[in-house]
């Protein structure tokens, strides 16, 4: 069997046998909101107890609280969920949408292209069968979360998000877990507790979006904004060269397991429409697309043949399928194209290059820009959010922060204000390849030019020297820009610039970017971000190996690395690892020093008191303590009875 067929067969088997996947020692828990059908899922990591004293036969233990963490996997991490990829996920938001009474179910699909696909019997074997007719806004209505927020309405989606962002971590009172360094948020308004009203205010202001198409009721509400947890997007999708529907559905499920907050389907190969249907119906996270890719397929890959009519029909097609956000390259203007002529890498955005070619071939202004108000009207009818694409982003650090890039950014700032006039939720896409010293300028300009609309960046990649490791080179920039205020990071996999990522590449990219996003949250001073770090550090110091693995982003890899060199059962409770061994473990030595100091009643004196002593007094005291230590066998541990006897003698 060829590698391609084998990969597809494995993906098919994955789908056929798909059951909920849980991380070790974790359980799915739900917090209920103000109504019974508002149940917010999250992962709860159970911890073992800490040994604080006693004997081997009669130990004294201190419990460690379970830790709730953000979970993107929806039903795929719930052992009680019944998973049937052919039926799709539960449409749990359907009742919320219907009770607002501002949408209507259509008799059939509106897109001419979709009608053609449905009439083609040759596609029956590829179809997702369990389809409902699409919904759209009633005439004269706007059904976006931005519209509701501006009218003072707190939707169930907003309450859901508030519960999800807090993760009930305010209930953790352990001072060791609650401690955190003072953050630097660069002007962000980060609340100690996220309330539904705060969510509403941020959405109404345009500083955050809730990407939830009314035709994607399976999606769990989430929010993108710099005053919330930093989110991560994963890209999947087939190409003309490789991949299949089965593989893309597998990647979707896999992406949510490893923490993708949203997923973009960037398919450019055959059966784009059918692939997307399977993905949306089985996705618990918002799905984004770049509609120009499919529009180009419809004109056989000839950019010059694109038209507004073809593109508009594509928007309707995808909106009625349930796409939650569109990347639209409406800022690539004709007059900006010559600015890229002297670049090292020219225009590297696929969407940007397509529109640049169309503009030059017709010597006309970008039709996405010319028809932008119509795009907004369409999005407002389905609550499709806009992601204004950066078609002029730099493809090398040599081209960073140039005239073309920032000219487009100015235009995106103009477009976001137009979108807001139509109550369309909008985010701004950013670079790209940017050296570390130029990253903050990007964030500052975006906030100023785009009136604090959420920023969504691809990296940025900080150096161009490491093909095969661009999840590292870009993860560095991603962590920095997340700290400066970027709301969502688009992951980069090890295959960036080299090929279409497989499952393992998707995982590696997501882990790298979850690290970057979390590091940004910690640096900003997010009130609960450091709790997980502290819990893991405490487990590490106490040699609770299993807890150390399970509290991490990738328990399986951590456990495998440890057991690779110390596979014995005894090593799972040992107070050392193979890095330093039993005699040189800094944490073991530190614990022994603590125990010794406590057993000897060593008095910890202030620095000022220490300085007040003469050099000779200090030297004499140190020599005395050294002699006593050696006289007792130079052992850090002593039997309790011996210590008690010595203390009694000292008191006498």
Swiss-Prot record:
Ligand binding ([4Fe-4S] cluster): 577, 580, 585
InterPro entries referenced in this protein's UniProt entry, alphabetically: ThiC, ThiC-associated_dom, ThiC/Bza_core_dom, ThiC/BzaA/B
EC number: 4.1.99.17
Catalysed reactions, semicolon-separated: 5-amino-1-(5-phospho-beta-D-ribosyl)imidazole + S-adenosyl-L-methionine = 4-amino-2-methyl-5-(phosphooxymethyl)pyrimidine + CO + 5'-deoxyadenosine + formate + L-methionine + 3 H(+)
HAMAP family registered for this protein in UniProt: ThiC
Binding site for Zn(2+): 433, 497
GO terms for MF: 4 iron, 4 sulfur cluster binding; carbon-carbon lyase activity; zinc ion binding
Catalytic EC class: lyase
Cofactor(s) in the UniProt record: [4Fe-4S] cluster
Physiological role: Catalyzes the synthesis of the hydroxymethylpyrimidine phosphate (HMP-P) moiety of thiamine from aminoimidazole ribotide (AIR) in a radical S-adenosyl-L-methionine (SAM)-dependent reaction.
Subunit organization: Homodimer.
UniProt similarity note: Belongs to the ThiC family.
GO CC terms of this entry: cytosol
Pathway: Cofactor biosynthesis; thiamine diphosphate biosynthesis
Record's protein name: Phosphomethylpyrimidine synthase
Gene Ontology biological process: thiamine biosynthetic process; thiamine diphosphate biosynthetic process
Origin species: Shewanella woodyi (strain ATCC 51908 / MS32)
Cofactor, how bound (note): Binds 1 [4Fe-4S] cluster per subunit. The cluster is coordinated with 3 cysteines and an exchangeable S-adenosyl-L-methionine.
UniProt xrefs under Gene3D superfamilies: 6.10.250.620, Radical SAM ThiC family, central domain
Record's keyword terms, sorted: 4Fe-4S, Iron, Iron-sulfur, Lyase, Metal-binding, S-adenosyl-L-methionine, Thiamine biosynthesis, Zinc
Positions bound to substrate: 235, 264, 293, 329, 349-351, 390-393, 429, 456
């Amino acid at each position: 069997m060829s590698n391609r067929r084998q990969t597809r067969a494995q993906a098919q088997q994955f789908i056929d046998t798909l059951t909920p996947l849980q991380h070790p020692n974790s359980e799915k828990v739900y917090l209920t909101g103000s109504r019974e059908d508002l149940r917010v899922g999250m992962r709860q990591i159970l911890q073992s107890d800490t040994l604080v004293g006693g004997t081997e036969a009669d130990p004294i233990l201190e419990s460690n609280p379970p830790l709730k963490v953000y979970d993107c996997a929806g039903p795929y991490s719930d052992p009680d969920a019944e998973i049937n990829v052919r039926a799709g996920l539960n449409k749990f938001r359907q009742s919320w949408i219907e009770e607002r009474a501002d949408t209507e179910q259509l008799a059939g699909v509106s897109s001419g292209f979709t009608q053609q696909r449905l009439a083609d019997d040759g596609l029956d074997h590829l179809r997702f069968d369990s389809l409902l007719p699409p919904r759209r806004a009633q005439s004269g209505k706007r059904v976006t979360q931005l519209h509701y927020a501006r009218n003072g309405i707190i939707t169930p989606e907003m309450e859901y998000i508030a519960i999800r962002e807090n993760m009930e971590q305010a209930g953790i009172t352990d001072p060791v877990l609650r401690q955190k360094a003072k953050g630097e948020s660069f002007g962000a308004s980060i609340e100690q507790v996220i309330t539904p009203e705060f969510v509403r205010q941020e959405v109404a202001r345009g500083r955050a979006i809730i990407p939830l198409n009314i035709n994607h009721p399976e999606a769990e509400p989430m929010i993108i904004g710099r005053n919330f947890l930093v989110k991560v997007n994963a890209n999947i999708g087939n190409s003309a060269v490789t991949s299949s529907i089965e593989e893309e559905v597998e990647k979707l499920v896999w992406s949510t397991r490893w923490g993708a907050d949203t997923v973009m389907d960037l398919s450019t190969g055959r059966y784009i429409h059918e692939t997307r249907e399977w993905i949306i119906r089985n996705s618990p996270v918002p799905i984004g697309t770049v509609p120009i890719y499919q529009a180009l397929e419809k004109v056989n890959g000839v950019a010059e043949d694109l038209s507004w009519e073809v593109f508009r029909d594509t928007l309707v097609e995808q909106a009625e399928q349930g796409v939650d956000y569109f990347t639209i390259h409406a800022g690539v203007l004709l007059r900006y194209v010559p600015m890229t002529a002297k670049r090292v890498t020219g225009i590297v955005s696929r969407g940007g290059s397509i529109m640049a070619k169309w503009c030059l071939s017709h010597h006309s202004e970008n039709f996405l820009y010319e028809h932008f108000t119509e795009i907004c009207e369409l999005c407002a009818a389905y609550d499709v959010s806009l992601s204004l694409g950066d078609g002029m982003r730099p493809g090398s650090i040599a081209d960073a922060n140039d005239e073309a890039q920032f000219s487009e950014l100015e235009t995106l700032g103009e477009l976001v204000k137009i979108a807001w006039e139509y109550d369309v939720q909008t985010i701004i896409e950013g670079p790209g390849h940017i050296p570390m010293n130029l990253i903050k300028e990007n964030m500052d300009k975006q906030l100023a030019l785009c009136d604090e609309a959420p920023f969504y960046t691809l990296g940025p990649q900080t150096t161009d020297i490491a093909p095969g490791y661009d999840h590292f080179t870009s993860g560095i920039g991603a962590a920095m820009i997340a700290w400066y205020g970027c709301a969502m990071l688009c992951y980069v996999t090890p295959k960036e610039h080299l090929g279409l990522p497989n499952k393992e590449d998707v995982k590696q990219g997501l882990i790298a970017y979850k690290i970057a996003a979390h590091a940004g949250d910690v640096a900003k001073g997010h009130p609960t971000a450091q709790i997980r770090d502290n819990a893991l550090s405490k487990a590490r110091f106490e040699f609770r190996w299993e807890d150390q693995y399970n509290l991490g982003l990738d328990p399986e890899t951590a456990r495998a690395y440890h057991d690779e060199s110390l596979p014995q059962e005894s090593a799972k409770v040992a107070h050392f690892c193979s890095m330093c061994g039993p005699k040189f473990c800094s944490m073991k030595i530190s614990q022994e020093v603590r125990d010794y100091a406590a057993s000897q009643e060593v008095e910890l004196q202030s620095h000022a008191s220490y300085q007040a002593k003469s050099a000779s007094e200090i030297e004499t005291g140190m020599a005395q303590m050294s002699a006593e230590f050696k006289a007792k066998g130079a052992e850090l541990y002593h039997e309790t009875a011996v210590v008690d006897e010595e203390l009694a003698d000292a008191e006498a």
